[in-house]
Amino acid sequence: MNPNCARCGKIVYPTEKVNCLDKFWHKACFHCETCKMTLNMKNYKGYEKKPYCNAHYPKQSFTMVADTPENLRLKQQSELQSQVRYKEEFEKNKGRGFSVVADTPELQRIKKTQDQISNIKYHEEFEKSRMGPSGGEGAEPERRDSQDSSNYRRPPEQQQPPQPHHIPTSTPAYQQPQPQQVAQSYGYKEPAAPVSTQRGAPGGGGKRYRAVFDYSAADEDEVSFQDGDTIVNVQQIDDGWMYGTVERTGDTGMLPANYVEAI
């Protein structure tokens, strides 16, 4: 069925049909409501679903309103409502905005370093909680505990040097009286000599590790090293700490296990 023209009411055939403003028009009937100038789809302007030319398009006029106390109150109330809504939207969206950062190797290295620092801090807090409060001594028990743990591993390294001094300057037959002389001079420390001798043998050929990060000593019983340094005579203390010697500097002490890798 062919529709009727919105202006003349006659049937509009497809060859002369204009579909605009939700209505159907003849091309000749699609003109300005005021001056009757024929319009097309490029130069018409619609107002209340009626076509107008640019010159006769109805202009919107504004009425001046006096600033009465009631109008001022309504204006202030509208501004307050807008401000409340703005704050409400701000609080809802607070903390949600974030920017996507590319996962580069540098960021991965920084993230891994931060995780390792957090692991070290957790280890320190664990040592503090294990010792418990100690009155007015403050942080002294923590330092003493770290020194005790390092001194527990140090005797194999400290008692190892005296052994080579006796080996090249004496024959095996002459070396037999040495443990007896130590026993006579120290008495109760007699068992320490054979234990030290047994542990000193594998100490020189201990495990070797390579540093994968730079580390600065946070305590006097720790050692500092740089990325690529070789750590020798390494001994495992626990899951988080090791004891060894930095081959480049010759310093011996505790070091974090997650800063090195086995060679």
UniProtKB/Swiss-Prot annotation:
Gene: LASP1
Protein name: LIM and SH3 domain protein 1
PTM field: Phosphorylated on serine residues after stimulation with histamine.
UniProt subcellular location: Cytoplasm, Cell cortex; Cytoplasm, Cytoskeleton
Lineage, highest ranks first: Eukaryota, Metazoa, Chordata, Craniata, Vertebrata
Domain LIM zinc-binding: 5-56
InterPro entries xrefs: Lasp1_SH3, LIM-SH3_domain_protein, Nebulin_repeat, SH3-like_dom_sf, SH3_domain, Znf_LIM
Keywords: Acetylation, Actin-binding, Cytoplasm, Cytoskeleton, Ion transport, LIM domain, Metal-binding, Methylation, Phosphoprotein, Repeat, SH3 domain, Transport, Zinc
Annotated disulfide bonds: none
GO cellular component, one term: cell cortex
Modified residues (Phosphothreonine): T68, T104
Quaternary structure and partners: Interacts with F-actin. Interacts with ANKRD54. Interacts with KBTBD10.
Nebulin repeat placement: 61-95, 97-131
Family matches, as Gene3D superfamilies: Cysteine Rich Protein, SH3 Domains
Region entry Disordered, spans: 123-209
List of residues that carry Phosphoserine: S99, S118, S134, S146
Ranges of biased composition (kind: Low complexity): 168-186
Coiled coil (UniProt feature): none
List of residues that carry N6-succinyllysine: K112
